[in-house]
Amino acid sequence: MSQKLKEADHEKVILFMHHPAFTTGMQAMDLLRLKNSHDFFSTIKNFNNVNHLISGHIHRSMCGLYEGYNFSTFKSINQQMVLKFKADRVEYAKGENSGYGIILLDGKNYTIHNEEVN
């Protein structure tokens, strides 16, 4: 990853990953986050081009700021997670719409959309 970030030194970089490196505030999901997240952030802090982090695994749309980095997640096209902050296990939502994200890239700009599906 370091080599690729170095090669993209003059570009804005959006990093995609399955497990989030950031905490979500949802205890059960935070237990499943990237195991070496400290190493991950130590690595990307050496570069000024990382602009946004996008991850899966959460099965909920959310965005925020963590360690100085903007992040986004999207709903799943399959099943959603119940929004519980103090749960020790993941629980699937019943009857909640599926969804997905669309990222429009336009040169050095980007826009992130969230779309729900019945």
Predicted segments with their positions:
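Binuclear metal-dependent phosphoesterase catalytic core
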Residues: T43, L65-N118
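His/acidic metal-ligating clusters that form di-metal
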Residues: M1-N70
